[in-house]
Regions:
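Intrinsically disordered, low-complexity, positively charged segments
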Residues: 1-55, 61
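Short acidic-glycine loop/turn motifs at beta-strand connectors
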Residues: 33-41, 67, 74-79, 86, ...
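Conserved phosphate/anionic-ligand binding catalytic regions in large, soluble enzymes, centered on
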Residues: 55-72, 301-305
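Extended Lys/Arg-rich, glycine-bearing segments that form polyanion-binding/interaction patches
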Residues: 16-19, 86-90, 94-212, 327
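Active-site-adjacent loop/helix segments that line or gate small-molecule/cofactor pockets in enzymes
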Residues: 24-32, 37, 46, 59, ...
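Conserved catalytic-core subdomain
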Residues: 1-17, 25-27, 168, 176, ...
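Short glycine-rich loop/turn motifs
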Residues: 28-30, 68, 153-155, 173, ...
Length: 354
């Protein structure tokens, strides 16, 4: 792919790596590429990061025809920069786009675009412990025309921002509230995609949980309001009587890259992983009879989020004495070890940016 480069006259001042937060500081450049019915994908370019212009009638602003991804670049102790399973993000975006009638952005072009931008932004990949460069590929319709329809033009972009440790105070268990009225996804819908509408629709549940003193909301299935699916914007796993349970990928749950990686590790360590429906009643029962040993969310931003308390209606259970479980800690240490190059990658998950 021929990528045009437009140099920024003055580079931005880089933030203090010890106070990065999440999503606050954008890097110097962004990747942009356009698609039209007539020409397909064209004009790949890396240009100075900054505002973009949109027509008020732009399809995306009215009908939400957009998708996005989330991934990271990591700097190893030796100074190398590496990505983590970027092809999985590319394939997931293809599936998201297909559901929203958006054009396919090929896997090889996706990975090449990410690598090209990260290479240009190498100085922005932080070196402080547990920091990384967050990468946000996204695509949206650019046609200016009202009326619900498949747009005739689209734009694919990538922006980046250095981020600190997701947990500034360390990896600590959180309290989550089971949401039994609102739903995140239904079969036949867009629950398996990474589109903005899914996240906009989840905000009310999050706000309700926070008002009651809970950090996240645990979503139930949209049909029966019975089976556990996701927690906040993360996949979730339960260790019950020595076995792992997590919701199956059946159209309502996002096929997480971290989720898939955790399942690989768990099975490699000899754990039985049940990708099956788990009812909230059985979950709470396990919490009360002592067989619920650990609960943790999984996702790119936090990697793993241990759960110390579950509330369903007026029923409350404490998980593992509100302490981080041994398996939760091992999963976190192993996966982050691979991502930052502290542990040999025997799975072939990391890709060095040269």
């Amino acid at each position: 792919m021929d990528i045009r480069f437009e140099k920024r006259p003055v580079l931005k001042e880089k933030p203090d790596q010890k106070n990065l937060g999440f999503g606050k500081y954008m890097t110097d450049y962004m990747f942009v590429m356009d698609w039209t019915k007539e020409d397909g994908w064209k004009d790949a370019r890396i240009v100075p990061e900054g505002p973009i212009t949109m027509d008020p009638a732009c399809v995306t602003l009215h009908y939400a025809q957009e998708t996005f991804e989330g991934m990271k670049a990591y700097r190893t102790a030796e100074g190398k920069i590496q990505l983590f399973r970027p092809e999985m993000n590319a394939k997931r975006m293809i599936n998201s786009n297909a559901r929203l009638c958006m054009p396919e952005f090929p896997v090889d072009m996706f990975v090449e675009a990410v690598e090209a931008l990260v290479k240009v932004e190498a100085d922005w990949v932080p070196s402080e412990p547990n920091t990384s460069l967050y990468i946000r590929p996204f695509m949206f319709a650019t046609e200016a025309a009202l009326g619900v329809h498949m747009a005739s033009s689209y734009k694919f972009m990538i922006i980046c921002c250095p981020v600190g440790a997701y947990y500034a105070a360390g990896l600590n268990p959180v309290k989550i509230l089971v949401e039994d009225e609102l739903v995140r996804a239904v079969k036949g819908g867009t629950g398996f995609t990474k589109c903005g509408g899914n996240y906009a629709g989840s905000i009310l549940g999050q706000v309700k949980a926070e008002k009651l003193g809970y950090a996240q909301v645990l979503w139930l299935d949209g049909e029966h309001r019975k089976y556990v699916e996701e927690v906040g914007t993360m996949n979730i796993m339960f260790k019950i009587a020595g076995e792992i349970y997590t919701a199956p990928i059946e159209g309502t749950v996002l096929p997480g890259v971290t989720r898939d990686s955790m399942i690989h590790l768990l099975r490699d360590w000899g754990y039985k992983v049940n990708e099956t429906r788990l009812s909230v009643d059985d979950l709470m029962k396990a919490g009360h009879d002592g067989t619920l040993e650990e609960v943790f969310g999984t996702g790119t931003a936090a990697v793993i989020s241990p759960v110390g308390e579950l509330r369903y209606k007026d029923d409350v259970v404490t998980v593992n004495n509100f302490e981080i479980g041994e398996l939760t800690q091992k999963l976190y240490d192993t996966l982050t070890g691979i991502q930052w190059g502290r542990i040999p990658d025997k799975y072939g998950w990391t890709v060095e940016v040269k």
